[in-house]
UniProtKB/Swiss-Prot annotation:
The gene is purT. This is Formate-dependent phosphoribosylglycinamide formyltransferase. Keywords: ATP-binding, Ligase, Magnesium, Metal-binding, Nucleotide-binding, Purine biosynthesis. Involved in the de novo purine biosynthesis. Catalyzes the transfer of formate to 5-phospho-ribosyl-glycinamide (GAR), producing 5-phospho-ribosyl-N-formylglycinamide (FGAR). Formate is provided by PurU via hydrolysis of 10-formyl-tetrahydrofolate. It comes from Methanococcus maripaludis (strain C5 / ATCC BAA-1333). It holds the Pfam family PurT_C. Residues 117-306 form the ATP-grasp domain.
Length: 388
């Protein structure tokens, strides 16, 4: 049951992190009459622009986070980013607050060490070989054991920040410095991963609901420097490989528990499925579902956490392509007229108050009768958007 927003019987969601994904979650939640409060470290973040109200705090600050939760007394606390004091969330959960999907799932998936140890050491899922390092000497030793080339990432970061490929011993110190510069929250620890020459990688959006676990059609994607660049749905998979992917996704999401959508990232090599990462929230590659599915990943997430039924059916093949800034500008302007002419394509601008070089400022979404054409149109439209 939901009440009426801004009245005493309102059902309230507190969104921790107010980026473009959270913005869409709030829009969907408000369609069900939910009162939405957005939180982030800077004013006028995308989700704040559609929320009933917002707070600006450092979410890694335990006292500030506790204060805003106790002030708002939300029915659901919905994390959207990694830079959150998860120990405070665990404390608040023991005091009766509901963290989506659970506080433990949020903590485990906020750092790569927690989720990798869970996946490989506890659940026995196939992963890339990995080591952890806390200083440069440990990193050099880990690289020797894993072998070159290999991937280095901070154990806590987002959108590919701090990730690099070590192609020779001369890259080690540079990669270490880059990882340290982008690390969030947990010192300078890094994960060193085996470089896998996979055939392709997918995101398998996995919805845990009161009625069971449902899987969206696989989403193919391309990352550049660890950051989402384009995605498409459906990505073709043979039935046995898809079944393996779904089995792996169910195993990890069942262990994490709770309700909501999970973005499970997987590599596929021949007919083998290799676990990469999981996010207990909508996934950036899943923005394509805004045009391909009966219900977008954001509607599915909102419905699942509210205990409502979901539909994961796909309607059309489609694709997404990021719109990135090439300039540094406060309150940028966008020329979108030409981009809007591209057939069966939609432009979604996030409304971020500052454009930075390489920052994701929007996305182009396209549908067609085949994925190839949709990808071409999404890319064309994205490149026609002029940010000034």
């Amino acid at each position: 049951m939901v009440g009426t927003p801004l009245f005493s019987n309102a059902k309230k969601i507190l969104l921790l992190g107010s980026g473009e994904l959270g913005k869409e979650v709030i829009i969907e939640a408000q369609r069900f009459g939910v009162e939405c409060i957005a939180v982030d470290s800077y004013e006028n973040a995308p989700a704040m622009q559609v929320a009933h109200r917002f707070h600006v705090i450092d979410m890694k600050d335990a006292g500030a986070l506790r204060e805003v939760i106790e002030r708002e007394k939300p029915d659901l606390i919905v994390p959207e980013i990694e830079a959150i004091n998860t120990d405070t969330l665990k404390e608040m959960e023991t005091e009766g607050y509901h963290v989506v999907p659970t506080a433990n799932a949020t903590k485990l998936t906020m750092d790569r060490e927690g989720i990798r140890r869970l996946a490989f050491e506890k659940l026995g899922l196939r992963t890339a070989k990995y080591e952890f390092a806390e200083n440069l000497e440990e990193l050099k030793e880990a690289v020797q054991r894993i072998g070159i080339p290999c991937i280095i990432k901070p154990i806590m970061s987002s959108s590919g920040k701090g990730q690099s490929t070590i192609k020779s011993e001369g890259d080690i110190e540079k990669s270490w410095d880059y990882a340290k510069s982008a690390a969030r929250g947990i010192g300078t620890k890094v994960i060193v991963e085996e470089f896998i020459k996979f055939d392709y990688e997918i995101t398998l959006l996995t919805a845990r609901t009161a009625e069971g676990t449902r899987f969206c059609e696989p989403i193919g994607h391309i990352q550049i420097d660890g950051d989402y660049h384009e995605s498409w749905q459906p990505h073709p998979m043979c039935a046995p490989t898809k079944a393996k992917a779904q089995e792996m996704a169910k195993k990890i999401t069942d262990e994490l528990g709770g309700y909501g959508i999970f973005g499970v990232e997987l590599f596929v090599l021949d007919d083998e499925v290799i676990f990469s990462e999981v996010s207990p929230r909508p996934h950036d590659t899943g923005m394509v579902t805004m045009v391909t599915q009966k219900m977008s990943e954001f509607e599915i997430h909102a419905r699942a956490i509210l205990g409502l039924p979901v539909n994961v059916d796909i309607l059309f093949p489609g694709a997404s392509h990021v719109i990135k800034s090439e300039i540094l500008k406060w309150a940028p302007e966008y020329e979108i007229h030409e981009a809007s002419k591209v057939k069966d394509t939609k432009i979604r601008l996030f409304g971020k108050p500052i454009a930075k070089v390489g920052r994701r400022m929007g996305v182009a979404l396209a549908v067609s009768d085949n994925v190839t054409k949709a990808r071409e149109n999404a890319e064309k439209a994205a490149h026609l958007v002029n940010i000034k």
